[in-house]
Amino acid sequence: MAFPTSSAQQAETNRKILEEIQTKKQLLIGLGSTTNQMPAPQLLGQPTVTAEFTQGVSVAPNAAGGIAAPRSAFNPTSSTTLGFFIPQDSYFGNSFIPVLPRLEPVPTSSAPNVK
């Protein structure tokens, strides 16, 4: 018999793999419960500046060779719009994405009912 314990070794390997998967699953469940919490919705017209955004705003050189802070564009825009912004990291210098609400079109009345 060349390999008398192949099924026992396979069972042991499978058990170790299942244990590893179970521990990773428990870690993900533990981490997921804290990261999946959605923030409270903001009222339209209120700026949404998070701590992560203000810390994550980087200073990027502009085309003229000077330094332009994205925050200088973010503050006036966020205070005058009906939407809100999602902070992001971008290679193109876009530090936030605007999210505008979808408004339903105003129904237009057709020809008046004549009897």
From Swiss-Prot:
InterPro entries, alphabetized: SOSSC
GO biological process entries: DNA repair
One Pfam family in the UniProt entry: SOSSC
Disulfide links within the chain: none
Gene Ontology terms: cellular component: nucleoplasm; SOSS complex
Signal peptide: none
Similarity comment: family membership: Belongs to the SOSS-C family.
Protein name listed in UniProt: SOSS complex subunit C homolog
Organism name: Drosophila grimshawi (Hawaiian fruit fly)
